[in-house]
């Protein structure tokens, strides 16, 4: 056991459950244990069934265990005060105002959450600290930050002494802190990385990709947990027997490719919620249990779930002009597959369609079976696909800004701008700029956005509002200021226009994705954005639920489908669990029957 244990993996693979069960295990062994989540759309409180929030909170029912959810807004306030506080009594008001202006950028939120995360690594109050991280692409970004920011502070100290987080002298201590964090993350004696994956091709692909990326910054994974394995003895009919065989193939591939110790966790016949269920998972996780438990019950019939298909068609297809379709939700609910199906649907109806992914761990290329890059690639005559590549967007953005500046400003000013642009937070600005170009564009009738998991999508959608507020202080010149403000206002208007933009929440019928999607709907509403459709994915077909195990899971789903209708009060489209992951246009076209039936 190392002191620091990180859980990472593709969205929806069960990271929070495995991290929580691990924390419970060590707490029950008598070790003072803390579990911290760095996911902005945390499910920790949902899993433990108690309020946690942005403070270290005792977990009810487990001695020695505390938990905390790092809330970005609260972390930002704390971070700003930590930087500015010591100067309030000794510096003039204009200097304080300048510091506050520097710390008002959207990138400060990312930095603040990261800074709070490092605080836990430097504390000495706990024997074990378990980190439940955001889905893989965002976790990689988090773990790269100590290196990126340390380099940026060092380079800025040689130049103007300014960073986007303020003068170097005010954050020099942070550089030392980030250097220490980097050393800790690379220390195998003190830190363990555990990848959680499902026995599915896309999950394996994501795990291998993330493992390679971590190695480039000197971090090696310690082991893997393969979660959600179908028990062989319940796969009696062909539908599940074929799924079982497919899973076993992926499990063998994973153990050959990753060459790390692997723990196998079986799918349960009900969802994991509450301390008792987590203790059972902890027992299985650390005992190496090789059998699944099944609750015996009397089979009861449930009606199939009916959706309003014509209304869905009207929502997704433009009557005039262009339309943007956003698909968001918890990781692992099938956003990418549904986005690809929607794109194929619109393109086959004669609309020129662009599929855009904003997820750093994007895999639309694997689903479409084409190579997707930072420029739109042709899939069919009416369908193109593109990935918002943060590094490519950063290079393009930096080049454009500097080219525009040459001739308008002095060489010293251009050099200072280049130094500022080398900040890691410029990558976020560049990716956002690319994102809004696709919203503004007029080249396509339908633009489908396959977004990152919920918390990061809400962050992306907040950016037009954040940057609009900052234009006053960030842009010089009345003409430039008015142009920038008008651009952000137009983006906000497009996002709020129900005729031009449709927000679709994707979930599967279990408590955690329902609660996360509901919170996302409320957050969007607060920003003036109305959700128009809920897509309930992975519904078990009644005809394949021929035993207690799958009968129990279907009854659970039907109960939650009724809850979805009541809670959201929106049209609901149901998608069945597919026998295999769709790959390529033929498989996606076959899946269109879920819309047409």
Regions found by a protein language model. Give the residues of each.
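Short glycine-rich anion-binding loops that position phosphate/pyrophosphate groups of nucleotides
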Residues: 135-137, 199, 332, 453-454, ...
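Short glycine-rich or small-residue beta-strand-to-loop segments that form or flank ligand, phosphate
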Residues: 6-8, 194-197, 325-328, 504-506
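Nucleotide-state-sensitive switch-loop elements of NTP-binding domains
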Residues: 1-13, 18-182, 314, 322-325, ...
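Short, surface-exposed connector motifs at secondary-structure boundaries
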Residues: 28-32, 189-194, 348-351, 499-504
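Walker A (P-loop) phosphate-binding loop of P-loop NTPases
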Residues: 12, 331-332
């Amino acid at each position: 056991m190392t002191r620091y244990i990180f859980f990472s993996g593709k969205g929806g693979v069960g990271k929070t459950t495995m991290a929580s069960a691990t924390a419970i295990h060590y707490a029950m062994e008598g070790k003072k244990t803390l579990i911290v989540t760095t996911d902005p759309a945390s499910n920790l409180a949902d899993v433990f069934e108690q309020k946690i929030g942005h403070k270290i909170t005792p977990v009810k029912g487990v001695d020695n265990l505390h938990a905390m959810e790092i809330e970005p807004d609260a972390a930002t306030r704390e971070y700003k005060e930590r930087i500015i506080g010591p100067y309030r009594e000794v510096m003039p008001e204009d200097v304080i105002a300048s510091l506050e202006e520097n710390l008002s950028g959207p990138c400060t939120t990312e930095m603040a959450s990261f800074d709070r995360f490092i605080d836990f690594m430097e504390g000495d109050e706990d024997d074990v600290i378990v980190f439940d991280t955001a889905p893989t692409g965002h976790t990689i970004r988090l773990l790269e930050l100590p290196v990126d920011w340390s380099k940026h502070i060092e380079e800025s100290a040689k130049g103007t002494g300014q960073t986007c987080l303020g003068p170097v002298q005010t954050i020099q201590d942070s550089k030392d802190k980030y250097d220490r964090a980097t050393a800790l993350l690379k220390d195998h004696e003190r830190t363990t990385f555990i990848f959680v994956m499902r026995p599915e091709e896309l999950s394996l692909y994501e795990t291998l990709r993330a493992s390679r990326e971590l190695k480039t910054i000197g971090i090696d994974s310690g082991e893997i947990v393969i979660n959600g394995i179908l028990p062989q003895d319940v796969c009696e009919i062909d539908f599940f027997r074929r799924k079982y065989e497919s899973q076993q193939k992926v499990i063998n591939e994973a153990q050959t490719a990753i060459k790390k110790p692997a723990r196998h966790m079986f799918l349960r016949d009900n969802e994991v919620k509450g301390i008792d269920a987590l203790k059972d998972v902890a027992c299985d996780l650390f005992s190496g249990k090789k059998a699944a438990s099944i609750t015996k019950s009397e089979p009861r019939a449930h009606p199939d779930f009916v959706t309003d298909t014509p209304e869905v068609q009207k929502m997704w297809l433009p009557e005039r002009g262009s339309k943007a379709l956003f698909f968001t939700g918890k990781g692992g609910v099938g956003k990418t597959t549904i986005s690809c199906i929607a794109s194929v649907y619109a393109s086959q109806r004669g609309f020129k369609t662009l599929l855009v992914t904003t997820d750093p761990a994007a895999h639309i290329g694997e689903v479409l079976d084409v190579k997707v890059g930072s420029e739109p690639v042709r899939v069919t005559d009416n369908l193109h696909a593109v990935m918002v590549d943060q590094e490519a967007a950063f290079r393009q953005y930096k080049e454009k800004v500097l080219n525009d500046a040459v001739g308008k400003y002095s060489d010293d000013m251009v050099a200072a701008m280049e130094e500022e642009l080398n900040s890691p937070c410029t990558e976020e600005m560049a990716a956002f700029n690319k994102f809004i170009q696709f919203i503004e564009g007029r080249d396509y009738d339908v633009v489908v956005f396959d977004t990152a998991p919920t918390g990061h999508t809400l962050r992306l959608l907040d950016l037009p509002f954040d940057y609009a507020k900052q234009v006053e202080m960030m842009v010089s010149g009345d003409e430039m200021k008015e142009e920038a403000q008008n651009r952000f206002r137009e983006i906000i208007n497009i996002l709020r226009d129900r005729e031009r933009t449709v927000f679709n929440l994707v979930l599967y019928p279990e408590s955690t994705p329902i609660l996360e999607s509901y919170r996302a709907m409320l957050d969007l509403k607060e920003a003036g954005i109305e959700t128009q459709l809920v897509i309930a994915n992975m519904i078990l077909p009644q005809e394949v639920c021929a035993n207690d195990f799958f009968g129990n899971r279907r009854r659970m789903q039907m109960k939650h489908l009724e809850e979805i209708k009541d809670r959201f009060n929106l049209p609901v489209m149901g998608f069945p669990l597919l026998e295999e992951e769709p790959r390529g246009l033929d498989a996606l076209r076959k899946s269109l029957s879920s819309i047409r039936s």
